[in-house]
Amino acid sequence: MSTVDQSTVTTALSSSSSNRHQGNDTYSIPKHSGTTSTITITMNEVSFVKSYLSTLDSRPIKLRSDHVFDPEQVGLRVPYTLPRLHAPHPEMPKKTKQPLAPGSSKSITVHLKSARNPALEFSLPNTALTTTSVQDLKDAVRERVTDAQGNKISLDKIKILYKRKPVTGKTIAEVLADEPVRLSGGKEVEFGVMIIGGAQVAVSAGAGERASAEQKESYEPPKPAVGPSGESVVATEAFWDDLQGFLEQRLKDYDEANKLRVLFKEAWRSSF
């Protein structure tokens, strides 16, 4: 059997005229040049060709490596499902500031200064390093300035600067983390203030600043109290009674306070 195209053989088997004689079929198969060629095929060959073609039809169609599917004609092979939503996370508990014992937190004097628009300068004495946040400084500035209509300035427009750069820490201690001398407490630090869009000093704040300045100028140190002082006070029983009362209040123990009173009094007498 000569080698011919599969479709050509199929067409010839189905539609071409045939002459059956002595168990043989004669088919006219067209050539590529337009002429026809007559070949003789036995019935066994016909059965083989039909079985071969049916085998080819049952096999999957092979596609080229660069074949592209039309997305409008090809449906999804798997159903499209939305991702499962996670359960909502519980809200974080709000942090409450616990009052610290007196003397447990180091303090510092904070000077806030705005060079222009508005020209503002004030101080916050005895400011705790670890508990005072940058937000607290913004609140202090916000209380002293207003916009052109007399309304409060938004906190987003108030910027706190340190060494001419916006601060990045949340508390004063974090801002001064690289300055251990200031973190020791008892020092002074100056922060710059910048208000986006400008502002003006509030009338109440200006009056308060002037009153504070006048109060400082008119301040006179109190005169010393007239009366016994020094060793003459220690020699009195009233002094030791007061000392014992203080110790009882702190220790909650009368016997221990009395014992310490005697011990301190004997030590004081032995110093002469």
UniProtKB/Swiss-Prot annotation:
Residues covered by region (Disordered): 1-35, 85-105, 212-231
Pfam families given in the database record: Get5_C, Get5_N
GO cellular component: cytosolic small ribosomal subunit
InterPro entries found in the cross-reference section: Get5_C, Get5_N
Main location: cytoplasm
Superkingdom, taxonomy of origin: Eukaryota
Intracellular or extracellular location(s): Cytoplasm
Domain Ubiquitin-like: 108-198
Keyword list, A-Z: Cytoplasm, Transport
Function statement: Component of the get4/get5/sgt2 sorting complex involved in the GET (guided entry of TA proteins) pathway that leads to the insertion of tail-anchored (TA) proteins into the endoplasmic reticulum. Get4 and get5 form an obligate complex that catalyzes the transfer of tail-anchored proteins destined to the endoplasmic reticulum from sgt2 to the cytosolic targeting factor which then targets the TA protein to the ER membrane via get1/get2.
Family: Belongs to the GET5 family.
Subunit structure: Forms homodimers via its C-terminal domain. Component of the get4/get5/sgt2 sorting complex. Binds directly sgt12 homodimers.
Domain notes: The C-terminal region (residues 201 to 272) is involved in homodimerization.
Record-given protein name: Golgi to ER traffic protein 5
